[in-house]
Regions:
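Ligand-binding pockets and gating/stacking loops
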Residues: 2-464
Length: 464
């Protein structure tokens, strides 16, 4: 198979935000008006069903057998399908139509060379692992397969996205929960959550990602309402009356009291608001990340993890690695990648060194990948088509072994040559890092048990 199915999303998902532009200020400042995930207008909004879902999630993840830890994940999603040949798996001895317009450079690890578009990553190669043999044969032009880490999770002809399989972030939300209960466990920093971030499938809306643009103002008290007033539990209880019907019949009023108190703490702690206050960051660090959409999201991801979020997905504009040719929005390989890669390169390299400087890197697993690779031969429009035979990805942190390359593609970047790494292997590695038993099963809508890792999936042995 050398191409993916038809485009899975229509043009309506191609937003105007560019990965080169700074983030809109409503994502950067505390006090965003968009509170739709947890808090609606006024104090009464604290009782929205999404809040109830989150509070029930806390009760679920605090059940016996779940050991809280500080392990977290940041997933950079390179929407559109990044070219493995032009980034992490260069073919310098191949013909020009295969090797493309870019050169290669040495890295900090002797013997490992990557595209000359990635000098910052080359400088921290000892902290990175490149996997050049990722099996993306089940994937299509959506985030579903790779973000779920499951070959059966994909867009199907009947429109039932993902076959009900949840994303790795949703599994993390259910079985690891948040690091800090004052924050949601799964956050998406993406321009288009629907197009770029896969959610919970049939696992339930409780475990859906919270969109970052909504998070900045989630937990602020409504205008004119003091924290002292919010802390008045009798007042809060009256305003939560309509939550009663959403609680299971077996839930006692004691449980409702717990949910209420937790909601109060979410507001009173101010942790979500503080996490979005980047004004406290050193301007030089912000410059290093890049004051662009992808750079500022990477910085926010670090702040989310630092504050207590478990799983964060970072994505730039929808499809911004979909480099079919110079006639389309994101252009071809040279015109598309040359201006884009300095921003992506800086964002990843700075995040890794920043996490290390703060003592967070061993607890934070960082992944960078897309849905598939791109064709070995450059087309007549100076682009590369979709390619599902093989792709490359990068991992860092997580207390794992780095400074290595795992697997390889053939001389043309056409197919996997050795050490195939599957989506389920990636999922097993992520869940092992998070302390989640990879044999765990959940109950689908059919009532049958479903493994969180597809058959055959094992943690990547070279890393762990």
């Amino acid at each position: 198979m050398n191409h993916s199915p038809n485009l899975a999303h229509s043009r309506q998902h191609r937003l105007t935000t560019s990965p080169f532009q700074p983030l809109p200020m409503d994502l950067l400042r505390a006090g965003s008006a968009n509170r739709r995930f947890f808090l609606q207008a006024g104090l009464g909004g604290l009782a929205g069903l999404s809040t109830a879902d989150l509070l029930k999630l806390q009760a679920e993840t605090s059940r016996p057998g779940v050991s809280p830890n500080k392990k977290s994940v940041i997933l950079f999603w390179l929407s559109g399908g990044p070219s493995h040949i032009d980034m992490w798996d260069p073919k310098p001895t191949a013909t020009e139509q295969i090797r493309g317009p870019f050169g290669t450079i040495d890295t900090k690890v002797p013997g490992i060379r990557i595209s000359d578009l990635l000098p910052r990553q080359a400088a921290v190669m000892d902290k990175l692992t490149i996997i050049r043999s990722v099996d993306c044969s089940a994937s299509n032009h959506t985030p579903i397969t790779m973000q779920a880490g499951h070959p059966l999770a994909r867009r199907t002809d009947d429109g039932r996205d993902g076959g009900g399989y949840p994303s790795m972030g949703s599994v993390a939300a259910k079985y690891a929960g948040p690091i800090d209960p004052a924050l949601p466990p799964f956050v998406a920093l993406a321009d288009s959550l629907k197009a770029d971030v896969w959610g919970s499938g049939d696992m339930g809306s409780t475990f859906e990602p919270v969109q970052g643009t909504a998070l900045a103002g989630l937990f602020q008290p409504p205008k004119g309402v003091s924290i002292d007033r919010i802390r008045n539990r009798n007042d809060i209880r009256r305003r939560f009356d309509h939550l009663h019907a959403s609680l299971e019949a077996s839930r006692s009023m004691d449980n409702l009291d717990n949910y209420t108190q937790l909601a109060v703490e979410m507001v009173a702690s101010g942790k979500a608001v503080k996490a979005f206050d980047v004004s406290t960051e050193d301007p030089r660090l912000r410059d290093a990340y890049g004051r662009t959409s992808i750079g500022e999201k990477a910085l926010l991801a670090r702040r989310m993890i630092e504050a207590g979020v478990r799983f964060v997905v970072v994505s730039g504009a929808w499809g911004y690695f979909d480099h079919h040719g110079d006639h389309v929005r994101w252009m071809g390989i040279e015109k598309g990648l040359r201006p884009l890669m300095p921003h992506v390169d800086s964002a990843l390299a700075t995040l890794v060194t920043d996490l290390e400087a703060r003592g967070l890197l061993d607890d934070t697993l960082v992944l960078m990948m897309g849905e598939f690779g791109r064709a070995p031969v450059i087309n007549r429009e100076a682009g590369r088509e979709h390619w599902t035979n093989v792709m490359s990805m990068v991992m860092a942190g997580g207390g794992m072994k780095h400074g290595q390359v795992i697997g390889s593609s053939d001389a043309k970047g056409h197919s996997i040559l050795d050490r195939k790494v599957t989506p389920q292997d990636i999922a097993a590695t992520v869940f092992t890092h998070l302390g989640i038993n990879i044999e765990t099963q959940w109950e689908g809508t059919s009532g049958r048990p479903i493994g969180i890792v597809a058959p055959g999936g094992e943690p990547i042995r070279e890393l762990i």
